Amino acid sequence: MKKVTWLGMFLMIIAGCIGVEKESEIKVKNKMNISPELQDIIRMGTLAPSSHNAQMWKIKIVNESEILVLWDKNRKLESSDPQNREALISIGAFIENFVEGAKKYNYEVEVKSFNSFGEDNSVAKLILNKKEFTNTDNIIKNIEERHSVKTLFLKEDLKSKDISEILDINKSNVTYYDLESEKGKYLKESVYKAFEKEAIDKGVQDELAKWIRLSDKEAKEKKDGMSAEMMGMGGIKKYFYYPLVTEKTIKSNIFVNSGIKVAKKQTENCSGYLVVKSSSNSISDLIDTGRTMEKILLKANELKIAVHPMSAVLHVEPWKDEISGKLGLTEPVQMVLRVGYVKEYGEPTSLRRDIWDIIVE
């Protein structure tokens, strides 16, 4: 009888929490009265990539023409991103999607990045102004279809035309290194060695375990992190993956060593690496880097070039300190992207939160 009573109380508490959450959500929706157009623009913003799919962004709607973009401190990656460098880059990608998505509804977006975090952790202001745009279907298609590809790529040279189209996005900050070039070989080796070192770091393992989803139910509830599909475990593979994987197994030597072996194959099987640098590590420069990165990813989707961010080389010593010099660059490297053609380009599988999960009052 006692067990039943406690179970009943537990279910009532859970039901109560769900009820409060729904009431709160409805209240926010009704109170803010956001237009369907702005809702869709925000949704397209949320399709941006982020480390561990942590989705570190929030927004505050001042009015239909003015939006504040905030860093969500509750989604900070303490071990792999202690300085919030990648968080700001991800926010920049969110902003770029917002800017491009707004064209669908004939809005030009002025972006004003801040020099420091606001009291509410705001980092940028977006101002929407009416302006007519045409032929936006391809822009929206690329936003909707963009995704990271973590499979092995074909070891084929990128077409000169494709390289030029990508480099034209930002010639001063984007460089391509062919896999067989001297610097391409340095990147291949360094990206792998850095991943190997980072993979055995306990703090990084704990952080990774927090963001790996262990069931379809958890993935559906949290709407973030890495599901089986995002890790290449679709179909029959997922059927076996979820029952076998726990937080403990994620940190096991077998799991870690398996990841290291996969990383080695990934670094060796591609066309080369794109490197994105910035003038400094300021908030505005990192946001600009994120915007540049997203422009690259959207163009790559159009060209059907697979892209896989490989960030460990920018987290771990000695590589994070030496990479700019080794590549002959005088400014900080912010992103390293493995690129190449693939037999099957695939489709997006990333989890995404609803727009009402990221809007704050």
Predicted regions and their residues:
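Sec-dependent N-terminal signal peptides
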Residues: T5-I13
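Acidic, surface-exposed loops and disordered segments
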Residues: G16-E361
